[in-house]
Swiss-Prot record:
Molecular function as annotated in GO: acylphosphatase activity
Residues annotated as signal peptide: none
Cysteines paired by S-S bonds: none
Keyword Hydrolase: yes
SUPFAM superfamilies the record matches: Acylphosphatase/BLUF domain-like
Broadest EC class assigned to this enzyme: hydrolase
Active site: R20, N38
Name the record gives this protein: Acylphosphatase
EC number in record: 3.6.1.7
Species in which this protein is naturally found: Nitrobacter winogradskyi (strain ATCC 25391 / DSM 10237 / CIP 104748 / NCIMB 11846 / Nb-255)
Amino acid sequence: MHEVVRQVMIRGRVQGVGFRYWTMREAIRFGVGGWVRNRRDGSVEALFAGSTEAVAEMITRCRSGPEFARVDDIEDQPVAANALKMIRPGERFSQLPTV
């Protein structure tokens, strides 16, 4: 199984609709590690790490998001595994503070 790490920027009505909580719940469900956080520009940023298939599924699911979200745009790109250092100790997936 091939492991990948992808950084994802999600734009639209994605703050104030439970997007971070939903992302964390879905990531845990699919066995994906990483983190999610709001950005001051109104977007949500996430880092997904796991099998190629699981990470691809997370990105696909983020295109719809939770019930009250409206996703206008998604960008994703590969990143180095050291980006995972922001995960809180003892957690596989973290919700980080806004930047």
